[in-house]
Amino acid sequence: MTTNPGTDNPPVDRPLTAAAATRYQQLRGHLAALRLHTAAEQLPAVLDQAASEGLSVTAALERLLALEVDATEARRLAGRLRFACLPTPASLEDFDFDAAAGLDRQLVAELGTCRYLESATNVILIGPPGVGKTHIAVGLARASAHAGYRTYFTTAADLAARCHRAAIEGRWATTMRFYAGPTLLAIDELGYLPLPAEAASALFQVVSQRYLKTSIVLTTNRGVGAWGEILGDTTVAAAMLDRLLHRSVVINLDGDSYRLRDHHARNEQLRRTTTGTRQPIH
């Protein structure tokens, strides 16, 4: 039996009566009307399989609908990933734990299950530049999207700029609802630059709206004791820390910079390629 899944033709190993052909076209029409487009496209192939494998009507229907469900979930995942705005393809699976001094692999693996989202627990990643904070944050955000959760990734500077524009344009409430919406909000690079007072206030309001409701993953290169300096207001810093740390996992990362390790590795490879010898990298 042969088919052409991309056409409207029914299976053609034997002639169909006019009534059977009509029912076949009606079935495809019903599937299309219900927006089950993958099922409509795959119907000829599944009917062929049902005939060749002797599938029952129930088994054939289950196979057809399973294809539709898989396609629907793939589209939804693609949409969640587009919305998430992840800056890199990083995942938890490709993180170099051997280079991250003292990082608890089991803890990161547990966070990768996304169970922490069920209790609106926050994750705070602290460490100097280049040790993998953003990689883990992106990995957690990617895992969240794959688990079916609405996820959004931004930087502290971008969040502040967006809130500033919203205040000027009269869209403050709408913007606050936007940041309150995702199950996981990842905020990268807090502390690289001091925030002006209005930006610190915006960040505090975002944290307050999500408090005990939804999770935040936050990366920073400054210890919590320096947040008063980052935010320009020790009172705001204390209030925000109180909300973030109330239900949280704090991960301190140390070790050599990822970017420096990559730079050294590229230099070493270049030397081997051009000279055939290995020389120490300084």
What does each of the following model-derived ranges do?
Residues 62-115, 119-122, 261-270:
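AAA+ P-loop ATPase motor domain of ring mechanoenzymes
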Residues 184:
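Walker B motif beta-strand of ABC-family P-loop ATPases
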Residues 28-88:
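Interdomain "pre-motor" coupling segment immediately N-terminal to P-loop NTPase/helicase cores
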Residues 1-29, 267-282:
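Intrinsically disordered, low-complexity and often Lys/Arg-enriched segments
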Residues 25, 29-32, 41-45, 59-63, ...:
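Solvent-exposed alpha-helical segments within well-ordered globular domains of core cellular machineries
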Residues 103-181, 281:
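Conserved P-loop
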